[in-house]
């Protein structure tokens, strides 16, 4: 039976790289995948899953209005659904992916952040934590050498930012992956 997977981590842990590798593994064996990323993530251009290591792939985009049930429907020959930036999924979209896994035997593997820069769950991540059949924490390290579990937003002077909108797209110039201690110390 297929499952809904949630593979989460702080930023810079290799989530997009892992997604691209999984897609390659399926396709190398002749299986079709559908890959989606959040429309609002434009760090590397819209509609791309991009690894900081270099590989990039054009993919389909989703936003809050995307209906995965209608989009994927009963499309034959799909072996797996892969979602990058899964923290931006809505509760309903996660429910749809869960239904596809259990009622259509179509696995969905979602990659994303668990929490925002204030340590709060994203709505999509909260629903994935509730419904995912299998969860895997991907690891990266803090500057101090400990395991990084938090995403710290920083200003132009590399100082911790504590206020602002939950979603602000940015890469290494705006965010640092840090351990809990460094997150609290700022």
Residue ranges and their predicted role:
Residues 84-86, 112-113:
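Walker B catalytic acidic pair
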Residues 101-123:
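Sensor-1/coupling segment of RecA-like P-loop NTPase cores
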Residues 1-72, 116-127, 137-140, 161-162, ...:
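Conserved P-loop
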Residues 141-168:
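Short recognition patches in nucleic-acid-associated and regulatory proteins
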Residues 86-97, 117-122:
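Conserved ATPase-coupling elements of RecA-like P-loop NTPase cores
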Residues 132:
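Short basic (Lys/Arg) and small-residue
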Residues 4-6, 32-34, 79-82, 107-109:
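Residue-level preference for the first positions of well-ordered beta-strands
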Residues 60-82, 91-94:
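Conserved RecA-like ASCE ATPase "motif II neighborhood" in helicase/translocase motors
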């Amino acid at each position: 039976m297929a499952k809904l997977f949630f593979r989460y981590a702080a930023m810079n842990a290799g989530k997009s790289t892992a997604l691209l590798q999984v897609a390659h593994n399926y396709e190398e064996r002749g299986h079709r995948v559908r890959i989606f990323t959040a429309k609002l993530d434009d760090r590397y251009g819209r509609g791309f899953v991009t690894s900081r290591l270099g590989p990039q792939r054009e993919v389909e985009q989703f936003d809050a209005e995307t209906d995965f049930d209608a989009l994927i429907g009963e499309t034959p020959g799909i072996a797996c659904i892969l979602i990058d930036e899964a923290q931006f999924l809505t509760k309903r979209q996660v429910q749809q992916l869960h239904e596809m896994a259990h009622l259509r035997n179509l696995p969905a593997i979602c990659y994303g952040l668990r929490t925002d820069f204030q340590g709060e769950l994203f709505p999509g991540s909260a629903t994935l934590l509730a419904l995912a059949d299998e969860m895997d924490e991907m690891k990266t390290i803090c500057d101090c050498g400990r395991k990084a579990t938090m995403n710290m937003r920083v200003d132009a002077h590399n100082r911790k930012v504590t206020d602002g909108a939950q979603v602000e797209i940015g890469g290494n110039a705006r965010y640092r992956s840090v351990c809990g201690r460094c997150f609290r110390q700022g």
